[in-house]
UniProtKB/Swiss-Prot annotation:
<dbReference type="GO" id="GO:0003899">
    <property type="term" value="F:DNA-directed RNA polymerase activity"/>
</dbReference>
<keyword id="KW-0808">Transferase</keyword>
<dbReference type="InterPro" id="IPR037034">
    <property type="entry name" value="RNA_pol_Rpb2_2_sf"/>
</dbReference>
<dbReference type="InterPro" id="IPR019462">
    <property type="entry name" value="DNA-dir_RNA_pol_bsu_external_1"/>
</dbReference>
<comment type="subunit">
    <text>The RNAP catalytic core consists of 2 alpha, 1 beta, 1 beta' and 1 omega subunit. When a sigma factor is associated with the core the holoenzyme is formed, which can initiate transcription.</text>
</comment>
<protein>
    <recommendedName>
        <fullName>DNA-directed RNA polymerase subunit beta</fullName>
        <ecNumber>2.7.7.6</ecNumber>
    </recommendedName>
</protein>
<dbReference type="Pfam" id="PF10385">
    <property type="entry name" value="RNA_pol_Rpb2_45"/>
</dbReference>
<dbReference type="InterPro" id="IPR037033">
    <property type="entry name" value="DNA-dir_RNAP_su2_hyb_sf"/>
</dbReference>
<dbReference type="GO" id="GO:0000428">
    <property type="term" value="C:DNA-directed RNA polymerase complex"/>
</dbReference>
<comment type="function">
    <text>DNA-dependent RNA polymerase catalyzes the transcription of DNA into RNA using the four ribonucleoside triphosphates as substrates.</text>
</comment>
<dbReference type="Pfam" id="PF04560">
    <property type="entry name" value="RNA_pol_Rpb2_7"/>
</dbReference>
<comment type="similarity">
    <text>Belongs to the RNA polymerase beta chain family.</text>
</comment>
<dbReference type="InterPro" id="IPR007644">
    <property type="entry name" value="RNA_pol_bsu_protrusion"/>
</dbReference>
<dbReference type="InterPro" id="IPR007642">
    <property type="entry name" value="RNA_pol_Rpb2_2"/>
</dbReference>
<dbReference type="Pfam" id="PF04563">
    <property type="entry name" value="RNA_pol_Rpb2_1"/>
</dbReference>
<keyword id="KW-0804">Transcription</keyword>
<dbReference type="InterPro" id="IPR010243">
    <property type="entry name" value="RNA_pol_bsu_bac"/>
</dbReference>
Amino acid sequence: MAYSFTEKKRIRKDFGKLPKVMEVPYLLAIQLDSYRKFLQQDKSAEERLEEGLEAAFRSVFPIASYSGNAALEYAGYEFGKPVFDVKECIIRGTTYAAPLRVRIRLVIYDRESSGAIKDIREQQVYMGEIPLMTENGTFVINGTERVIVSQLHRSPGVFFDHDKGKTHSSGKLLYSARVIPYRGSWLDFEFDPKDQVFVRIDRRRKLPATILLRALGYTSDEVLEMFFDTNEIAVEDGIYRMKLVPERLRGETATFDILADGEVVVERGRRITARHIRQLEKANIEYLDIPAEYLQGKYLAKSIIDQDTGEILVECNTELTAETLEKLEQGGITDFETLYTNDLDNGPFMADTLRADPTRTPLEALVEIYRMMRPGEPPTKEAAENLFKNLFFTDERYDLSTVGRMKFNRRLGREDETGPGILYDGRYFSARSDEEGKQYFEQMGGETSDIIDVLRTLVDIRNGNGVVDDIDHLGNRRVRSVGEMAENQFRVGLVRVERAVKERLSLAESEGLMPQDLINSKPVAAAVKEFFGSSQLSQFMDQNNPLSEITHKRRVSALGPGGLTRERAGFEVRDVHPTHYGRVCPIETPEGPNIGLINSLATYARANEYGFLESPYLKVIDGKVSEEIEYLSAIEEAECVIAQVDAKMTEEGGFEEDFVTVRHRYEFTVMERDTITHMDVSPRQVVSVAASLIPFLEHDDANRALMGSNMQRQAVPTLRADKPLVGTGFERHVARDSGVCVVATRGGIVDKVDASRIIVKVNDDEVSEGEAGVDIYNLTKYTRSNQNTCINQRPLVKVGDRVAARDIMADGPSVDMGELALGQNMRVAFMPWNGYNFEDSILISEKVVKDDRFTSIHIQELTCIARDTKLGPEEITADIPNVGEAALSKLDESGIVYIGAEVEAGDILVGKVTPKGETQLTPEEKLLRAIFGEKASDVKDTSQRVSSGVKGTIIDVQVFTRDGVEKDERARQIEQAALEQFRKDLKDEYRILELDILERLRAVMVGKKVNGGAGFKRGTEMTGEILDGLDAEKWFELRPADDDVAEQLERAQQYLEQHKKEQDERYKDKQAKISGGDDLAHGVLKVVKVYLAIKRRIQPGDKMAGRHGNKGVISVIMPEEDMPHDENGVPVDVVLNPLGVPSRMNVGQILETHLGWAAKGLGERIGEMLAEQKKIADIRVFLDKIYNQAGAGGTPEDLDSFSDDEIIELAKNLVGGVPMATAVFDGAKEFEIKELLELAGHDRSGQVQLWDGRTGEAFDRKVTVGYMYMLKLNHLVDDKMHARSTGSYSLVTQQPLGGKAQFGGQRFGEMEVWALEAYGAAYTLQEMLTVKSDDVNGRTRVYKNIVDGDHRMDPGMPESFNVLLKEIRSLGINIELEND
């Protein structure tokens, strides 16, 4: 088995027994793929598919003028190069975007001859900037990294549902159908309690559904024919005879004797059963004599027309009465049809609706619809027809989308999954005269009707045939990712442009305008900017640690535009659904109001072409599990029979047991092995990335696992990352895919390494033609993340190391040797200790603080802005009025703090003065100014100072100056340093290239003769020593005798010169970019950003947690010598409360502790072997015991492929503990942990006798001691501690503000007032309600008194009393206070 560069150095013992069938997919694919499809940047204009930007342009263009004489056509787009790269955009606070240029063709038609083209003008039009995605799936918008979260919304299509009996008091189920398009009006059909069908458009007032059918052009007769079967009645000699369909009689009660061959088959009043029907069928009766009473109450199916006069005798849907029957008889009608209905499965719903329908003609129906959509406007025929057409029948206003059409056709049981984006109706389109209508009619014909099919299905469901849909089913919800949402926004912008363009197009022909004059790109740019800047789904990236980044990008939210809202989402939407299996994690979701609405993608899930989530499964062919992987969506999965991943298998790949636990139709059940069609690919298929990092997840309660998943995302990167001793084996994937590490793009040999960059000389076979073959990786050093934590990369490679593509070469924050490392391994004991671990408190040892185990670095960015004010420009300077020398000691001559200065609260970081208006001077001041020439008093000090409670070191300063404003010395120094760094990179690249070329030339030239040059005589033979002694320039002066060699030498020289030229151009570009002025906001002259690094040690009040939802606050830090210790005198680091385990049911933490104890013990034993300098063979044997013998099952490791040096390096890295991987649902068993404990020389119980460090006495019983992975969470007491004496007040109520951010006070609320009232503490109460709150004069006096040492107070009127008076007056009641 092949190990990567970092895996070789430290192998995790893997307990997994199940075969690893499938590699973990790239974790950020959902973001990157979606946006790549949107931009299609890598394809030429001709190759682009109709999706993303291309689709948006094609849907809006061509734009024709109102007269039809001019049109704008679209001919492809291209992107320019972004001005700044990602890092520069973050520093400068700009958006990382590329300019979009679109080729537009203006076609002008000849007015006289129709269709002839008079003129064509083509031009590239600038359409604004489109933000680009960074390689890690984020966007840089105004200098901050943001993530666009994918949205899980209801798929377009048709859905059938009922109201669960909530609408009507009787609890009757009212069924409804809803057609949801991708864009356009919603169409609802619904039953009311009287069983009539109504239609609503866009949730407006309801109308009888038949109005819509009438508007489409259907007559009453046609409607009845479409929805009902009929009974044929013939009249012979005054006797009514009904054509017998025996099946229709089942379940009815006979109202007359039914005869067959003269015998009574069914007596009057009896219920007709299946036996009776069989008898009737046997008798072969075609017509049944029926009494006239039987027909009364039935309805006519077709209008009856007098053959002679052509008038309608009786309209269809008329109830038959004795009078109507007589009328028919008089008219000489011998046969007619009645509607066949019954109460069971053929309700009279549409017939009832038709009778409630007031309209008679299509025009009346259109007018009725117009009145409902536009109440109060007078309808005209054209307006009504237009409105109706624009609702559902035109591409511009209505689009089901391919997904919607597919779902629509599938739900209605049609064969074909494709079709038009509009709602099609054959009858309506046959009558349309416009071009679009004719095209659709030719394509689709006159048979199909979407609306009728929906109604039919709805009526069928009401009749008891068919079921309603489950809207929480993942087959009915789809994922909208970045690309799709950006496309929609872009289209919105284009539609706005279209409106403006149409107006101007009529001018185009007369005034000779070009496309650029017609198109204003502002609306497009504004729509895109609004989406990326302020959409609900464009979120500030959670950058606490690599895991929180990855999780944020894989998040799926049901909220956002077009989605649900928190308040309206019910319990069902939030709940775990069977279709979530393998698609959405059932564990990871926030606690609080968003629970269940924000989810995380499962590890292996992906979205298919339609946006539905799919999960991979292995196909089972002929009872054997194949290697073929098939992705199934939630709908496809229903009919499959899917075996669990841990089903027992035979050698040949078949199933061992006859009956296997499977999933079928979303239920867990047991089925025969022959029926199985698929099998899961991995045990962690069910859970998300964060949950798959929790070892022994299978032993934790779900609620605690949820907390564990969420709290890992809040872990602060520690100063030195420490890999978890007990992991799940997934840490490596997260670290690699998160993008915080430096991953080799191509293989090669490391040429140079320092703390800030790695240079790799690429393997020859990976170098493409005509490029340098040098990869330079600049590392990120001490940079601020979005959450103010520190991003820092440290190289792992040494000079001369060989790396392969995708190897990790440098660790990022919270990464240790290529593995995610969010916390530290702590030696924990589970025992009570003097009440210091009451209620989940945590007791830690001073050693943890001393060793800086949980010390973290936080970086704050402080910005000072110099603006142009009305009184004059603000100035950044060290010349600040009324400030002593000491305060200026840390500033340079430009007034900006030095890098490396240690500052604390109140120190000046950037000196700034603001001009203030001329003030009237007192005579004394005038005198002083006259004597000393003091000019400084016309400016005031507005310097940027360090805020309260902050103490740290300045690590970086950035200065941005507006174009045209002279740069200060500091800005020039910063620019110089940046250019120097760039120059250094170029030099190194050139040096390696040169060495590489000379090395190849050397191989060719050794032993060859030269015809002089470089001071050599003709015929001199070149040896290795001579060549090694030559400078690079001298090489190219040589004149080899061999023509081939001479040609190679010349080619090499040209190549190097060309490369040098390219480098010079790159340097010039960089120089222009750096030294040019900056594009700052309006009125801003200069911006100085100061970065302050703060070191935070762990302290009481900080929140810590394990990975199992076991969180707590540090109560006290005890001296090392007072902590409980074992027989060797080794104290524990952390003492946890054992009572935190049983009730919380997260036993995983105990198993982790035991396994950690074994891991550490094994490391210590390896350490002893190294210290005793045991033979390498012995170390190999012991390692083999650990990896391949202890804990029988696990994955074997190929230690024989390691050289002796590699074994020693591995052993040295294992001294701190042998890392273990216990994968989710496939982890270590109890007996394996016991075996390892034994191998490590510990007791199998995992418990140890401890002694009290203070008294030296042994505790009464043994204590569970081991190693647990603890995290420090980003809820630090430093950020929460806050105190106020006086400060700012609210404007209206004059009460102190609240919260640390506003430097607010403690609210003494209603209940606290009750408490004081209950104790009768009148004076305290008075003080609280007046001088400490909103008695403006009183509080000023008290403050003055306290300063003077006088502790009296005289309370006055609280301001809130005046507010109350004003409120009463605003009600129109005059109220005045009387003065005593």
